[in-house]
Amino acid sequence: MARETRSPSPVGSTHSSSKRSRRNDDYLDRSRRDDGRGHRRSRSPPRRHRDRDWDRHRDRDRDRDRDRVRDRERGRDRERDRDTYRKSDRSVDRRDYRDDVRDDTSYRPSRRDRSRPRYHSRDREDGREYRHRSRDRRRRDDSADSKSIAKRNESRDRVSSKDFTGKSREVSKPSTPAPPIAQTDEEKKAERLAKLEAWKQKQAAEKERKQKELAAAGGARSILAEIDKRSTLRQAGVSQETPAPQESESASAKKFDPKTITKNAAAQPERLSLLGNDVAVPNTTTSSEVAGRNGADSTRIAPLKPRGNVSGFGFGAKSAAELEKASHKRALDFGDEESSRKKLMKLPDPSLEDNDTPNGTVNGAEEEEDDDGDIDMQDGGTEEENAAAARAAAEKREERLQNQTVALESQPEQQPETLETDQNGSAEPMDVEDEEEIDPLDAFMSGLKDSVTVDASKYRKNVSKPKQEPEAIFGDEDDVDLKAMDFEADDFLAITSKTRKKKDLPTVNHETIDYEPFRKSFYTEPVDLAELNDEEVAALRLELDGIKVRGVDVPKPVQKWSQCGLGVQTLDVIRKLGYEQPTSIQSQAIPAIMSGRDVIGVAKTGSGKTIAFLLPMFRHIKDQRPLENMEGPVGLIMTPTRELATQIHKECKPFLKALNLRAVCAYGGAPIKDQIAELKRGAEIIVCTPGRMIDLLAANSGRVTNLRRVTYVVLDEADRMFDMGFEPQVMKIISNIRPSRQTVLFSATFPRNMEALARKTLTKPVEIIVGGRSVVAQEITQIVEVRPENTKFVRLLELLGNLYSDDNNEDARALIFVDRQEAADGLLRDLMRKGYPCMSIHGGKDQVDRDSTIDDFKAGIFPVLIATSVAARGLDVKQLKLVINYDAPNHLEDYVHRAGRTGRAGNTGTAVTFLTEEQERYSVDIAKALKQSGQSVPEAVQKMVDSFLEKVKSGKEKASASGFGGKGLERLDQERDAARNRERKTYKTGEEGEEDEEKEKKEKDKGEELFAKAASAVQSSSAPTPSATPGVPKGIDLDGKITVHKTERATPSTTGTNPLDKVGSAVADIHARLNKAGVMRSGVPIDNKGPDAGAFHATLEINDFPQKARWAVTNRTNVAKILEATGTSITTKGSYYPPGKEPGPNENPKLYILVEGDTELVVTNAMRELMRLLKEGTIAAADSEARAPASGRYNVL
C-alpha cells in the first residue's frame, strides 16, 4: 500500500518545488472540499468549526511567536509535505491510508460522515486538545503557507487513534534532521506536533509556576498530600458511575478536580509526586504511547471540558448537567450563573500568588518550551500530569497578559475568552449529542461575562479585602441584574414621563460669575443735529411719519446713514443694497440703540425694523474681542415663528461676509445636529425660536453653547412672543443672560397689556412708536365685504381673475389667509381644481415643507399661497400685491399683520377681507383699523359694529380684548401637575395627596386616561368592588391582581326534578340575559366550556384603547413571542365599537382578548405581558398626538 506507513518519502514528493506556486490557488478549493467532510473525519462536532472566528482573534498575538519558531524548525519539512499532500489529497492512496481507520472500507460520502462521531466516540478523543490548539495557531498565521498548513493539519487530524499509535513513533524520529525531501511526514503530522508542543509548554509552565507557589505555600508535599486525600475520598463514588468530563481547574495549586484526580490516582497513584519536581519536564512515554493510551483509555477518562465559570483566576466547579442546563437558558436564567459564581468563590483565591510570578519568568518558560523539539514531548508525564499541565498553561497565559498592564481592563476581559475557548477546544465530553446541543455562542458569552466579573473582584481583593467578600459583591450584582431585567410594566410610565419631560435650564447666580466688561454706547451726536432745538426736533419727528418717543434723554433722529456712527464696511454694504436713507423707525431707533439704551420699537409693517436692530448689533459685536473656543454668541435674536427667523438670518448675510462674522439660525423642525455642529464651530449671532434655544442650551449638559458672552438681545415681534405662550421660555432664557445686557424689542403691534409684561425684561427703556401702535400702512388699500359663506369662494375666483387679467400683474403674488389648517388644505384643493397653481402653509406641516413652500412662493414658482396666521408676520415678498382674508381675523393685531404682508417698503397693495353676518364680533376691530389708517368704513360693516355694541350694552355679548390673548404655558404646567397627581394616586406611589376626586376628573389628559384603561385586568366576580379611582372606569382597579378563572367543563344534563336544580337554571337564565348586553364586564368569566378550552383563562378588553395600543397586543409578532414564552393560547374576540357606541342586546361584546392556558401561572404571565404592551402602545399614541396635533388655531413653535 502506497501510504501504509506514512514514511518521510511519500509518492509524489519530488514535485514539491514545482508545485509550490499552487499553494494559494489550491487553498480555496481544498477549503471547500474540507468544509464538506473535514470536520467529520476529525471526529469533532460542527461547533468546533464555528468557534474558529473568535479563536483566530483571541490567540493571534499569543501564539504567533511560537508558530514562527516551529516554522523555522520544520520549514523545510513543510515544503515537501505541502506538495505531497496537495497531490494526493483526494487520491486512492489517501483512501487506502484511511482504510486502517475505517476498517478497510472505502471512502464514505459526507452524508454518511455526519453521524460517524456518534459511533466512534472512542477514536474521537485522541489528541483532541492537541488538535484544537494546533488549529488555533495555524489560523492565526497570516501567511498563505500557514493557511495551507492549517487546512492540511486539520485534514491530517482525521487520523484515528489506531493509526496514531502505530505511526507516531516512526514519524517523530526524522522530524528535525531530515532533508527537505524527507519532511513529508512532518508536514502531515504538523497538527500532532503542535499538540505536543502545546502540552509541553503547559507542563513546563506548570512546573515553573508551582515551584514559586510551593515556596510561598509551604512546599509541594502539603499539596500532594491534599491531592492524595481528595483522591481516596472520592474514588469509591466516582468509580461506580460513568466518569464526567474533566474540569478545567483554577490557577490554584492547592486544589484540582477531584473526579479527574480520582480516576488517574486509582491507576497510577505513585506518579503524583512528579507534580512537585523541578521545572524540568519528567520523562514519560513517547508521543505514540501517549496517543495510544488516549485511544485505549477514552472510555475510562473523558477529555477536559470547562464546566464552571471562567474567571481571571481559574475555573469554578460545575456539574455537566448544570452546564448543559445553563447553556440552553443562558440568555434568560441567571440562577445557574449565580450558583456557579458562589461555588467559584468557595475555592481558594490564588490571585495574589499568581501575580507574584514574574512576567519575565513566564515568558522565558514559554520561549524555553518553544525551543524544544518534538523529541522533548516524549518527556511528557502521565495523563494526570498532562491534564494538570494544561490547566497550568492556561493560567500562565492569563498571568502573562495581566502582568503586562493591570490598568488596562481590556486584556483581562479577553483572557477569560481564551481560557474557555482553549478548554472547549482541547476537551470535549463523551456524549456527542449533548455536546452538539451546547450553543458555542452562549458558552462563550457566559464565560466572558463571568470572567469580567471575577477580574473586577480580583482587583478589589488586591486592595486588602477579605477573600470571601467578592461573593457578596457577586450576589449584589446578580440582584441588580435580575431586578433590572424584571422591571414592572408600571415603571415604564415613569421612564416615559421622564423622557417626555421638558428640558430645564438651571438657575444662574450672576453674582458668582465674573463677567468681562463691555461697551454699549458708540453714538456721538453729529454737530448738525446737536444744534437743533426742541421745536425743530419735534418738527423733524412729525415729518418722519409722526414718531412718538417716551423716555429720558432720547437721542435726536438722524437723517443720513453717515450720522449713525456705523463702520465703513457696514456703510459699504448699505450702499450696495440700495438703502438711500434711513426709514422713520431706523432714523430714531438706531441712535437710541447705539447709545446703549434699551428700546421698544413699534412701527408699521414693512418699515425696516429688522435693519434697525441689526446695524447696531454689528457695531456692538465688532467692539468686543473675538470668540474663543467653546464660547457662546454675543448677539441673540429671538422670534416667534420659524419663517421670521430664517428671514432675519437672510438679511444678516450681506453684512456677515463683510464684517467677518458668523450667524446661526436655530429653529424647531430642522435637525438639531446640524445646528449643534454650526454652534460648535463658533458664531457671534444666533437667530432662534425660544423652544429650540432652550434645547440647545440644555443639550449635552450645556456644553453645546452658553450665554456667558451675550450682551445684545433682540425680541422681534415681541408682543407675539409674550402672548403666544413663549413668556416662560423667554424669561428663562433671559434670566441666564447677564443683567447688564442691552435688550431691544420690536413689533408692528404692541397692546398695552403686552407692554407691561415686556417691560420686565428692560431697564429704563426708550419707547419709539411710528404711525401708531396697531396701524395698517397707508399704502395698502383695504376692502371689507360682508357676504354669505357660500359666496366667498366665487368672489375669491373673481379677485384672482381680475388680478392676473392685467398684463402688468403677470408676476404678482396673492396671499390668502384662513383660520384653520383644515380650511387651508380644503381651499388648496378647490383652487387647484380651478386651475390656479398654489400651495398651503400652516403649523401642521413639516418645517422642510414650510421653508420650501415660502422659497417657491418668493421665486414665483406658484403665484398663490394659502396660509394660516403662521405666515402673517415677517413674510416679506416684494411682488405680493393682493392679500385676501378669506376667514376674518379675530382681533386687531392679527388683521394689521395680515394686511401688512402687502404694500411693503413703499409699494402699494390691496387687502380684501370677507365678513359673514355671524362675525359681528370681528367687525369692531376691522372697523377700528380702517379708521386708524384713514380709510372709510363700509356701511354694512358699520351696521355690524353698531349691532354688536348694542348687544354688549345689553349684556348679550362681551367685548373682546385686544391682542392674541395667549394662555401661555402655565395652563400646560397645571395640566401636567394634575396628570402627575392622578398618576401617583392611581399607582399609589406614596406621594399622592388628598385631592378631591371630582376635581381630578375634570382634568382631561387623553393619554393618561387611555393609559388608565390599560390595566383592565379581569377580576373575580366575588372580589370586592374596587374603590373609585379618578380617570379609571368604574369596576376597574389598576392595583388589583390579575385573576385567572378556572374553566368549567360541560357536564351531562340530569333529568331530575330537584328544586335546587330549578333555582340554579333560573339563575343561569338571568345571567345569560344580563350578559347579552355585549359588554365584557370585569370579573365575569366567559362562557368557555368547549373540549378545547384551557384549564384556566382570563380576558382583557381592548376596545377603547387607541389604535397603536390595540395593534401592539394583536399583531402577529408580539403575540407569537408571548405564545412561545408562556405556551398559552391568545384569541381576539368580540367586535370593535367606535368611542361612544355601545353594543346592542344581541350584538357581540366589545373587542377583547381571551388568554387560555393549562396553569394559572402561564395565564398570569401572558396577561402581564399583554398589559405591558397596552401601556406602551397607549403612551406611544399619546406622544405622537402631542407631537403632531390634529388641528389647532395656533401652534407653539
From Swiss-Prot:
Region (Disordered): 1-434, 956-1036
UniProt source species: Coccidioides immitis (strain RS) (Valley fever fungus)
Similarity comment text for this entry: Belongs to the DEAD box helicase family. DDX46/PRP5 subfamily.
Biased composition, class Acidic residues, residue ranges: 365-386
Pfam families from the UniProt entry: DEAD, Helicase_C, KH_12
A single Gene Ontology CC term: nucleus
GO terms for MF: ATP binding; ATP hydrolysis activity; nucleic acid binding; RNA helicase activity
GO terms under biological process: mRNA processing; RNA splicing
Keywords tagged on the record: ATP-binding, Helicase, Hydrolase, mRNA processing, mRNA splicing, Nucleotide-binding, Nucleus
Compositional bias per record (Basic and acidic residues), positions renumbered to this chain: 23-37, 51-112, 120-129, 151-172, 185-213, 321-341, 968-991, 999-1011
Protein's cellular compartments: Nucleus
SMART domains found in the cross-reference section: DEXDc, HELICc
EC numbers for this chain: 3.6.4.13
Name of this protein: Pre-mRNA-processing ATP-dependent RNA helicase PRP5
Domain Helicase C-terminal, chain residue ranges per copy: 795-945
Database matches in PANTHER family: ATP-DEPENDENT RNA HELICASE DBP3
